[in-house]
């Protein structure tokens, strides 16, 4: 049974695409066709995204103070809006869901302008610029870490959690069994979907300072930018540490599932996946994130005892080496941290968000949805 088309719009980074992918799987299972609007950056994820069709619509962010750049961006947005209006008119979706990032602006402006029931999903604890620009126009706002008491938009905000992909749910079934003294210790290091330059130097430097008997236990999976990959590999080879280093791992969820400890940034999708899988982590919020959203994302997990959060400026090689040495020596503490992380997870977020999408598509209000689903997003 074909229930119609749901159009998903997401910026082309993992933080936006992954929750959209999770919702797409759920909607497809319920009988909907799913189309994705994104930008060219999303090509690396396209193979696993269960879309009936993927559309690239022109868009741009207006961040420059250069008048010529601003004019170019405005023109690109105008072209994108016209393209998106034609697409929405042609597809006639029953609902449109935006997941943030500037590529979502044209399709959401088009859908709301044409009267199509529309929702935005904000993954972070602090709303991003694209979603802020669209918040007043949409029927509902779904939040990952966004508080339900969302200021002027509290009435239409639902705390759904961040949808996680089937691969993450599969990894969550792997029980956490911490490495014991003398056993191999699996360390997974990544900086979100695009890697992190800081970790490329900081982690090898920290491992270098560890005692030989501890260093010999460590096996590293590390995401590194293409330009950093060779130097990171060389650093680990010099230390005699086994390491798998790559700019992108298509099976990162299963690698997290096999990890004893994770070191990462604290983007919303990362924190959500760590909590659903239930793995101890050292989170280092990206210091230049707009509105410091990564620090806010990590706060709840840290408060629950599910992660250690360290500012990048305070994380010297000596500090990180000490943290790693303690982790290798205290498997019981790692087990407790893993359990605390898992207790905060929301593995059913995709189902809750899909329920909200169906409610809005059927013309029901957010208040009706909250009343019917008492305790959800209240």
UniProtKB/Swiss-Prot annotation:
One annotated Gene Ontology cellular component of this protein: plasma membrane
EC top class, as a word: transferase
Family annotation (CDD domains): GT28_MurG (cd03785)
Keyword terms, alphabetized: Cell cycle, Cell division, Cell inner membrane, Cell membrane, Cell shape, Cell wall biogenesis/degradation, Glycosyltransferase, Membrane, Peptidoglycan synthesis, Transferase
GO annotation terms (biological process): carbohydrate metabolic process; cell division; cell wall organization; lipid glycosylation; peptidoglycan biosynthetic process; regulation of cell shape
Database matches in InterPro entries: GlcNAc_MurG, Glyco_trans_28_C, GlycoTrans_28_N
Pathway noted in the entry: Cell wall biogenesis; peptidoglycan biosynthesis
EC number assigned by the record: 2.4.1.227
Entry similarity comment: Belongs to the glycosyltransferase 28 family. MurG subfamily.
Functional summary from the UniProt entry: Cell wall formation. Catalyzes the transfer of a GlcNAc subunit on undecaprenyl-pyrophosphoryl-MurNAc-pentapeptide (lipid intermediate I) to form undecaprenyl-pyrophosphoryl-MurNAc-(pentapeptide)GlcNAc (lipid intermediate II).
NCBIfam families recorded: murG (TIGR01133)
Name of the protein this chain belongs to: UDP-N-acetylglucosamine--N-acetylmuramyl-(pentapeptide) pyrophosphoryl-undecaprenol N-acetylglucosamine transferase
